[in-house]
């Protein structure tokens, strides 16, 4: 799939695209955003509610198989944490005030697989397992799902396999839950994937296929192999409605947490949410769920590395999955391994095009610096890609286009939710190395 040469030639002359080519950090406000209710909102709301109910049915099973979820009775959820100290550090670093409250959605602390992918990835595997068991007549929705631990179920599921292409975190979530249920799982991993993620999957009995190419190639190869096996279910990060629904459930969970903090998004108290974006499924699902709940009172921005701005490029050009960052000469090489995606999901891009407020890009060095600052100020440890959201309010208030967007709203009482997408499963020595890089970069910056 490649862009027509004439279209690409015209695009390369665009001044904004030139900034992307030069790997400059940019802020882009989406001119295609529409006000008002979402199309087919009732249908989507029903599907998301059904996904939530399915998670509830599986909760007793999850609580028993994964003891770390027992306290939450098998519900896979993360805390919402105010980051006033981090906000203060950034105000000092950028020498300007950032109005409003800053909250960190701590998906890096999600149980089982330690990232936002625990939402969509685990959900799709659970749905597949439930469908198989229901069709076989082994299970009814009214059953206590703890019976899924029995050998008759794990033996039954072992006849089936699951495949997925991943830069790391999606593979972890699907591999861990799939193996626990008894499925044979194969994760097709791109060159960007961290070694510790591959090692952990192999420890769980998952087959890891490694590729020297990027994420899109790993997905394509996984899809191709799965098509040859009628007993293999391929979880397609680029096109999956079920992954999307699993992520969308996060919106109602966040609403419950905001309600507990007496935060009611409105014209007077607008909600700004910043989500790191790879292929688009995770942030797309969360964004869609939030827009269903809060409508025009929530403003969602996607964050991408300067070397991998695939969703921004797809949205800005209107070409979606028909264009890749490599088409404009970018290398898709970034320390933000979870975001190292060259081609966006067209399914997600087209769905979120009318509701997304915008996108921005962030340099690797900034991610490391933010990682260190957050560790020091709040004792929260995220992996580099998960810090992309933290740069959102900075870009909103520091760039001309960001300020132009913010001026339309009452920012004094705005609430900024930064989505921390992964980190708790990173080995201690790797996290310490990230922290050292960030500390060194910050020191050099302060010496200038």
UniProtKB/Swiss-Prot annotation:
Catalytic reaction list: D-serine = pyruvate + NH4(+)
Please indicate which superkingdom the organism of origin belongs to. Answer: Bacteria
Q: What is its EC number?
A: 4.3.1.18
The cofactors it requires, by name, are: pyridoxal 5'-phosphate
Q: Which family does it belong to?
A: Belongs to the serine/threonine dehydratase family. DsdA subfamily.
Q: Which NCBIfam families did the record assign?
A: D_Ser_am_lyase (TIGR02035), PRK02991.1 (NF002823)
Protein's UniProt name: Probable D-serine dehydratase
Biological process (GO) annotations held by this record are:
D-serine catabolic process
Arranged from A to Z, the UniProt key words for this protein are: Lyase, Pyridoxal phosphate
Instruction: Specify the enzyme's EC class, one word.
Output: lyase
Classification via InterPro entries: D_Ser_am_lyase (IPR011780), Ser/Thr_Dehydratase (IPR050147), Ser/Thr_deHydtase_PyrdxlP-BS (IPR000634), TrpB-like_PALP (IPR001926), TrpB-like_PALP_sf (IPR036052)
**Residues bearing N6-(pyridoxal phosphate)lysine?**
117
Q: What molecular function terms (GO) are annotated for this protein?
A: D-serine ammonia-lyase activity; hydro-lyase activity; pyridoxal phosphate binding
Q: Which residues cross the membrane?
A: none
